[in-house]
Amino acid sequence: MDSISTAILLLLLALVCLLLTLSSRDKGKLPPGPRPLSILGNLLLLCSQDMLTSLTKLSKEYGSMYTVHLGPRRVVVLSGYQAVKEALVDQGEEFSGRGDYPAFFNFTKGNGIAFSSGDRWKVLRQFSIQILRNFGMGKRSIEERILEEGSFLLAELRKTEGEPFDPTFVLSRSVSNIICSVLFGSRFDYDDERLLTIIRLINDNFQIMSSPWGELYDIFPSLLDWVPGPHQRIFQNFKCLRDLIAHSVHDHQASLDPRSPRDFIQCFLTKMAEEKEDPLSHFHMDTLLMTTHNLLFGGTKTVSTTLHHAFLALMKYPKVQARVQEEIDLVVGRARLPALKDRAAMPYTDAVIHEVQRFADIIPMNLPHRVTRDTAFRGFLIPKGTDVITLLNTVHYDPSQFLTPQEFNPEHFLDANQSFKKSPAFMPFSAGRRLCLGESLARMELFLYLTAILQSFSLQPLGAPEDIDLTPLSSGLGNLPRPFQLCLRPR
């Protein structure tokens, strides 16, 4: 690009930023925050290598509620359990909008369930929850699917024969098959090219969006669209995933029986047919493709990433692993796989899983929210349409809620009698109106997968347990666990 073109591009960017800044000066009394620079906002204060740490550091200076400018975009940041709970739970309706997330929104155009707002979001969410329940989410039928898939996973793990291996791909394939069976009506063989493509695309995008490139794109999307870098693969990957889903939808249309839909896609197609004469219907091809995309992405990555963190923690703390295995042997034995009915009798295992989720904190900054109306909150007035970042990391590491927040400690979820205890500050699935609709499915998968694996194997690191690093490789959209290999020793 020559110097004249560069100058024109920078001038246009400056004009856009100026217009955005002027348009944001509407009514309202926002909390204080660092003074922004023109165009850059507070970018110089925010270390692009670690946005989370930078925002958390600002909360120590400005308190649990402050205003920050991500480039030209003005955002309110909430930190700590009390502030986040008051927003997402106590005033859930006002904070139920979806904030701007260019890496997702520029692709979904607000058509998917995760990145829509208003009536569209409410209609799609209600419909999706009902269909997922109909197909067994939280019930015995989905438990049977998980147990079946768990058996396939155990067979794959046995093939390692005690040799070192990276569990990333085998875990992702198995976990993804659960949501695939709900969305598409059947599971894939582990060597099926469609499943391998799904895993590759989702893993690549999650990694990019959890990197400095992903964070920078979400601050300056218009500029970064013209800059080469790994962020350019985000939309290429999303398009490939969309095309794969569209091909499956085409096959589903050919075999659709409206009287007996066999999976989520066919239920959605049936609803589309019922409302085809309604010009205001939210059920059309774009919302089907994007909702399926959102469910596939979330249903694949959150559980598999949590299992990766769990493996690392259990290898670093072998006494914790041994105690979980002792509880499995006592309650379940070896003659059958663990079942959900066992969870109530396994408080320590339940506490360990919750502590993994708290400590791993895989979506540390949550997805952005947006206030749906002018909102009075904590003595301030947040104008309608203002984006809000709720730092879930500061909830999960809040010293007022957890005795030793910086340590991996299952006792955080056990009472004096060693019975399981809930914590209101446990928010790995967010909270309030935007609570992840796959929460119950994810909790089932985590319990059934982890107990089945530890019933059959012991996890052994290649080096000393104390050398295992539990800090994330990078933080952005998610906290990425560090790559590792391990050996599985049959029990």
UniProtKB/Swiss-Prot annotation:
Effect on the protein upon substituting residue 98 to P: In allele CYP2F1*6
Enzyme type, top EC level: oxidoreductase
Protein topology in the membrane: Peripheral membrane protein
The UniProt record lists the keyword Iron: yes
Gene Ontology molecular function, alphabetical: arachidonate epoxygenase activity; heme binding; iron ion binding; monooxygenase activity; oxidoreductase activity, acting on paired donors, with incorporation or reduction of molecular oxygen, reduced flavin or flavoprotein as one donor, and incorporation of one atom of oxygen; oxygen binding
Residues that, per the record, bind heme: 436
EC number(s) reported in the record: 1.14.14.1
CDD domains noted in UniProt: Cyp2F
Variant or mutagenesis effect after changing residue 218 to N: In allele CYP2F1*3 and in allele CYP2F1*4
Biological processes annotated in GO: epoxygenase P450 pathway; naphthalene catabolic process; response to toxic substance; xenobiotic metabolic process
Effect of residue 266 to H: In allele CYP2F1*3
Subcellular location per the Swiss-Prot or TrEMBL entry: Endoplasmic reticulum membrane; Microsome membrane
Entry's Gene Ontology cellular component terms: cytoplasm; endoplasmic reticulum membrane; intracellular membrane-bounded organelle
SUPFAM superfamilies linked to this entry: Cytochrome P450
One Pfam family in the UniProt entry: p450
Family: Belongs to the cytochrome P450 family.
Reported function: May be involved in the metabolism of various pneumotoxicants including naphthalene. Is able to dealkylate ethoxycoumarin, propoxycoumarin, and pentoxyresorufin but possesses no activity toward ethoxyresorufin and only trace dearylation activity toward benzyloxyresorufin. Bioactivates 3-methylindole (3MI) by dehydrogenation to the putative electrophile 3-methylene-indolenine.
Protein name: Cytochrome P450 2F1
Protein source organism: Homo sapiens (Human)
Gene that encodes the chain: CYP2F1
